[in-house]
Amino acid sequence: MDLKTVTGAAVELSDTAFGREFNEALVHQVVTAYLAGARQGTRAQKTRAEVSGGGIKPWRQKGTGRARAGSIRSPIWRGGGRAFAAKPQDWSQKVNRKMYRGAMQCILAELIRQERLILVEEISVSGPKTKELIAKLGELNASRALIVTKEVDENLYLAARNIPHVNVLDTSEVDPVSLIAFDKVIMTVEAAKQFEEALA
């Protein structure tokens, strides 16, 4: 597959890594699993059995005119236990390496088809200057963008840190969610070659 950088230089990338047909079910499964794995799973609530108190019947069964009640810790009472109490649980899902690789291939190929992937020879700033990076993003028409480089340049990272909807990652940090979360993905040729090597 032949692609062009912003300056018009031709870049040849493998069809396996960047030309795969989009598989929505696969991408959905991998993204869902990734988001599930990010959940803390530490939520804990008490059932009526675990809430303190409520051992005695609050009033007799008949003759008071009130609705019958057996415990002040019933789920319908204020201060009662939860009917279906949440407990700590592990939300992580298993994703095979082959599935993960396939989802990444699908997403990268779809970014190219939708013209959301911008290839550049390099992207850098002279110092940690946000204004300079905003100007460069303006030239590329990418105000909400993920910048992917082979290795994160500290100046670039610091310059992007204060811009909303802009993030800088190196190839080892990129995941399916980060790729689809931005309108545009600005990728250096070096980073694209590294993805080609990892995904081909």
Curated annotation (Swiss-Prot):
Keyword 4Fe-4S set for record: no
Keywords: Ribonucleoprotein, Ribosomal protein, RNA-binding, rRNA-binding
Biological process per Gene Ontology, one example term: translation
Protein biosynthesis is among the record's keywords: no
Name of one Pfam family that matches: Ribosomal_L4
Gene3D superfamilies: 3.40.1370.10
Molecular functions per Gene Ontology: rRNA binding; structural constituent of ribosome
GO cellular component: ribonucleoprotein complex; ribosome
Region (Disordered): 45-64
Domain of life (superkingdom): Bacteria
Subunit structure: Part of the 50S ribosomal subunit.
Similarity annotation: Belongs to the universal ribosomal protein uL4 family.
Primary role: One of the primary rRNA binding proteins, this protein initially binds near the 5'-end of the 23S rRNA. It is important during the early stages of 50S assembly. It makes multiple contacts with different domains of the 23S rRNA in the assembled 50S subunit and ribosome. Forms part of the polypeptide exit tunnel.
Protein name: Large ribosomal subunit protein uL4
Originating organism: Psychrobacter cryohalolentis (strain ATCC BAA-1226 / DSM 17306 / VKM B-2378 / K5)
Gene: rplD
